[in-house]
Amino acid sequence: MDDNYRIFNKNLITNAARRGTPQVCTGNGGFEPQPFDKEYVLQKNKIEECITKTLQSIGDGRISASAYDTAWIALIKDVINRDLPLFPWSLEWIVSNQLRDGSWGDRDFFVPCDRLLSTLACVVALSTWNVHPNETERGILFVKENISKLEDGDDVHTTLGFEILFPALLERARNLGIEGLPYDDPTTQKICAERDLKLDRISKELIINEVPASLLLILEGLENLNWENILKLQSPDGSFLGSPATTAFVFMETKDESCLSYLKKTVQNFGGGAPSLYPVDILTRLLAVDRLQRLGISRFFHSQIEDCLSYIYRFWTGNGVFSGRDSEFCDVNDTSMAFRLLRLHGYNVSPNVFTNFKKGDEFSVYGDDEVVDSPSTMLNLYRASEVRFAGETILEEAKEFSHNFLQQRQGLPNQVLDNCLISKNLHTEIKYELETPWFASLPRLEARFFIERYNAVDEVCIGKSLYRLPDTNEGTYLELAKLDYNRCQEQHQMEWNHMQQWYEDCNLEEFGISKNDILEAHFLAAASIFEAERSGERVAWVKTQILSHILSTYYFIKQSHQDHKPQLSTEKAHIAGQPGKGFKNVQRIISILFEALTQMKKDALEGSNGDISDDLLHEAWGGWLKKLGEGETEERQEAELIARTINVCGGHILSKQILSHHEYKTLSQLTNQICHNLHNSKMIGKEMENEMQLLVQLVLQESSNGISKAIKQTFLVVAKAFYYRAYFSAKQIENHVSIILFEQLV
């Protein structure tokens, strides 16, 4: 092979051989996949059942309760007896959930803004009804002793609207005559000054006539509002952007019955408490699908994922989506995640939704003047922009903006800290995405990275208070991902042993092939088509890649033109070897090819992939050899040959009719062109990007009377493997091979 591809040193080959599991080879050069052991099956089924139940019961989405929002609901007075709370059980929830240090807020993660705002809100609620004085005093003491922590260090994890909401609550506390709070503390004065500056920037026109989403979430911190106009922005469920605190405030001011219905339902569902956002049905489904896909275990939950995506698509609008259904407003974070996942699964979604968030040269959170300043949000926008089709200018602009933003944050110390998410691995995740474009990100490469850095269990979202999403924060996702990864890796190692045996038995070294070449081909196949049950397709990929290379490099085959139907046989082909290569060697490589094709068919049949005609594989090779013999080397057909072999062995192509389909021909030609250029030039420029975008469009877009998704996906899989090989250096590929194929996950 090309010297540039002789990348693996002898130590890697030696170590690979040592680490491989015992091989299971048949006597005729075939490969027998390792059966699943009972312990693995039982463990896998148990975890899978648990995750399935969770996915099927998402409903409105589970979310942790918020002391801040609960306190606002506890402030509501009974409509008949104004001296009593309308939601007394919310007061009981507050008392039951005070932390040991006297504060309220997230129990496991201390963020000063969250603790101080939540504690102050609970103090105001308890003082309003003059109940539980001991708990109230402990809360007051906590605020007084910890207000200075807002000045400690660079706390980027500032909760949403803190500089507006905290002073507003302090004013309520002052009006109630609550003593002991740090009203005149220098830190408090600084926060109030920030509040005044922000309010000065908000024009009276916006507040009175057109409230942007960024302000709608913090209405409880504002004054002199036009309630008639604000009520026009109410969601169908009665809430305001799914915020219980804001909705409680609106009800106190307007007595709107829809607000009350929403609050009653929420408090009932949360046992007296209330979350920071509700519902979170869209966000929960987005995170579930995204994590299952990136962890490499989505195939176990195909129907559940389709249900989730179908649900999300029901609420997809020309403006995008929000974390909860039927929202009057949409945000760029949820819209980016939804766009990417829906497009990848064949849904018709327009990139024009992102024009709603474009403000000049920047992108905003809600489509208003609040520019995105969150690395996690910008990462989702960047990932969405990577699945663009040719000519989608708005996604090019989104990619340029998000890429520059993320690069700048990566280069500054502590600037990857996020104001929407607390995640210890966000920095490394951004680094991976910037260094590994989607076209070069093979499934096993992404899964390995994501599994090793998966910390969803510890992730905390930042709104007006901190919150968690239990449906997607469970450790079962990671448990299944590790179990499946190691099982697939065992299978890949057994296949590697088989490929080494095949290499020795066929004496491929005589044809200029090294074990390094076999290992590289095996890695590309295993990293692209990783599922343990698809062993036959991987082995077919490797043998096709190796044998086509031998034939195209060392021999020129002139097909007899006497037959209209090309036949793959030593008798019908005129074979002329290179100097020093005898006719017997040519006969032997053709014999090896015949044996390989026979075994491919057998493996496919044993894999229950349906009946496979000998003609499908033989004619694929016959056509390829004929074109090679006619001198058609300018546009090599290797990629299409690999793709067709995979599709035949995978049971996706069962008749020759599909090969003459216009869509199939277009995909074949484009894939061959892309892979030929990547193989020869190793340069990835604008033209290559455009060709890949066109291929992605052909693969992902639904078409009437088109070929199956599985067939189309195979072309993209092969093209991405060629892209990967051209994009990464020899040293990087060597490292990937070692990690992905031979280092077990623990």
Swiss-Prot record:
It holds the Pfam family Terpene_synth. GO terms for cellular component: chloroplast. A motif (DXDD motif) lies at residues 331-334. Gene3D superfamilies: 1.50.10.160, Farnesyl Diphosphate Synthase (1.10.600.10), Terpene synthase, N-terminal domain (1.50.10.130). Mostly expressed in stems, and, at low levels, in roots and leaves, but barely in flowers. Disulfide bonds: none annotated. GO terms for biological process: gibberellin biosynthetic process; terpene metabolic process. GO terms for molecular function: magnesium ion binding; terpene synthase activity. Belongs to the terpene synthase family. Tpsc subfamily. PANTHER family: COPAL-8-OL DIPHOSPHATE HYDRATASE, CHLOROPLASTIC, ENT-COPALYL DIPHOSPHATE SYNTHASE, CHLOROPLASTIC. This is Probably inactive copalyl diphosphate synthase 3. It comes from Isodon rubescens. The gene is CPS3.
